Amino acid sequence: MTWDATNIFLLVANILTILYILYNDAVIPLWKGKTVLTVKLRSRGRWDGYIFVGIIALLFISNTFFREGPQLTSILLAVMGILFIYICFFRSSKAVFKETGLFYALLFFPYSKIERMNLSEDGILVIETNRQRLMLFARSEKDLEKMLAVFTKYN
């Protein structure tokens, strides 16, 4: 087993992916106070994930069976494939509402920084802060009503 640049890159990518999963699924629900509401959102760009998992699978198959590449590289590619299968197929994007703000796309946005909110006809809640625009794609009308109720209560 050799630790060449490819294997080091794959190891770092796997560690960062594990940290992302832990932060998103374990830290965010506990951080910044009590969770008031967690809403699963409609997924966007699902095909990007499928393509990425397919590329990782092709690299794994190519390295393992056709090139008979290093075993460590195959193991790291397999681990990366499993991690991204979890991210793409089993995990869904969500908005986590706390008493002081909300987590969306791994970032915390305090309610005090929200300048404007708009609701589109197709169920997209657009939240404008002083720096960026957040687009929350609600899965159902019930989820949208729950989000709006939290905003009216804590804002």
Curated annotation (Swiss-Prot):
Subcellular compartments: Cell membrane
Protein origin, superkingdom: Bacteria
UniProt key word Secreted: no
Main location: membrane
Protein keywords: Cell membrane, Membrane, Transmembrane, Transmembrane helix
A Gene Ontology cellular-component term: plasma membrane
InterPro entries given in the database record: DUF986 (IPR009328)
Membrane spanning stretches: 8-28, 46-66, 70-90
Annotated membrane topology: Multi-pass membrane protein
Family indicated by similarity: Belongs to the UPF0266 family.
Protein name according to UniProt: UPF0266 membrane protein lwe0739
Organism the protein comes from: Listeria welshimeri serovar 6b (strain ATCC 35897 / DSM 20650 / CCUG 15529 / CIP 8149 / NCTC 11857 / SLCC 5334 / V8)
Taxonomic placement: Bacteria, Bacillati, Bacillota, Bacilli, Bacillales
